[in-house]
Amino acid sequence: CIPLGALCNVPFTFRGQGQLVSRPLEPYYAIFRAQGLPCQTGVEGRLPLTVNGRLRPGYYTLPGDVSSQFISGLLFALPLLEKDSSLTILPPLESAAYIGLTLRSLARFGIQIRQKDALHYKIPGKQRYQAGASRIFVEGDWSQAAFWLVAGTIGSREGITCCGLDRDSLQGDKAILTILSHMGADLIEKDGSVTAQAAPLAGCEIDASDCPDLVPVLTVAAAVAKGTTHIIHAGRLRIKECDRLNAMATELNALGANIQEEPEGLLITGLDGKLPGGERVDAHNDHRVAMSLAVAALACREPIVLTGAESVAKSYPGFWQDYLAVGGRSEIKDE
């Protein structure tokens, strides 16, 4: 939403909490400097950020390997400028699926983006968002379904079924089906639902370029699998709500896993069975870490204590109710 704030031509301030404050914003700062757009930041370029002015139409360039959110932000804002603009993405491009979702959403609301290829876009100016269809179907979330599919595979006697999923979705995280199947999972697809049943897993190589949000829960699956799993091209996870690579390695190792950090990924030697558990672990104020550790608890011999469990509210407020519904057990401890 930063580019949208840079359309207002009045001071617009963005604030954040936790790790969000220190997430890199240099791609936007470079644009502001090039256009002479006044902005003020916190220490070392961190939030809060105040931008005062208005973006100008023209030629824009962004790196493709930092975050697709920078690209989506400009695609939302540039159509509202007075004249046409172009956007070039510098390779390598990661998380391309998220850009596809952005383009589809823009089209639904009357915005035209001319895409030459995955790296080049022409954005006509003087456009306006239109209400479009009175009713829009919101498809199921493969990112959230991934937690239950892993849970059904490693920690459920009766299996878990996720409904309302579109096999032809543009969501990159539908890769969970391919990855879990490659690891040996027993997945049954039927009429928009997927059922995951308990099955022994085997390690493999996982390229996280286009599905980084799957890494935390796939790390759990790999920790109890047989053999070695190598997660690669996942360096961007170090600048999410927390350093997710470090968080998952630290907390799962505390539960008895064997995980080594690498600059761009994780090397996981699976236990070929349950984790010992019985320890206190922390969610690092990160919703995906919290949900992944909850799934890990299903594959632990002893109960765990999870601090920061409330962080699931960022993306999945009903997670703990669903956790109980599929057979998980939890209780709140006052400390």
Q: What residue spans do the PLM features occupy?
A:
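Short, structured segments at the rim of ligand-binding sites
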Residues: 1-335
